[in-house]
Amino acid sequence: GAVQDYDRGVIVGTQTFGKGTVQRVDQLSSGQIKFTESKFYRVTGSSTQNMGVLPDINLPTAMNLDKFGESELPKALKHDKIPTSKYRNFSRIEKIKPELKSLNSNRIDASIFYNYLEEIKTWRKSQESEWINLSLTERKKQKERIETELLALENSLRSKLNLPTFTDYQSFLERDEDPDELNIKKKEIKETANILIDIMEISKAPLIALNKTG
């Protein structure tokens, strides 16, 4: 969060899990007890508790992040604020963030892979239910349906990328390491590099002017 507060860079990725507290563990005769004894805050006065750090530029993920983090705990401390501290803002990035977001959005919208991640995320949400069928026959049918749907999503992506597809779900599970086209970590690194290039390109004219006058 300090990178954002001092305007020294761009946070790229997904929202963090929202832990902004400090715990102490004391020993008991038959176990341990954990106390939450303090909270920490950013120089802006905002806590990361329950909210985490929000990225400047979101990258799609197949995970439903609402299900993770301290905010999901029933008695987690709430997000709050304290008075802002005195600090120096470097004013380097904030003014170009709208353009960075626009350029990133255009690439994400055109990306077959990132559209696939959104499809997987939507599919996972559609599978959420508070009910569990206790019938073994129905459970087997449900398992087969899930495997069929996941295989169809995977093969659809691979077809669009001109990659080999799978004939059945088992061969999909036993596949070798995914190629670069399907490696989410490498995709994220590549997009982050693209954002860095955008920053350099957008900032190029002022930097050249500075060099000429210097």
Where are these regions (language model features)?
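Conserved acidic, small-residue-rich alpha-beta core segments centered on
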Residues: 1-82
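Conserved functional hotspot residues or short segments at active or partner-binding sites
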Residues: 48-212
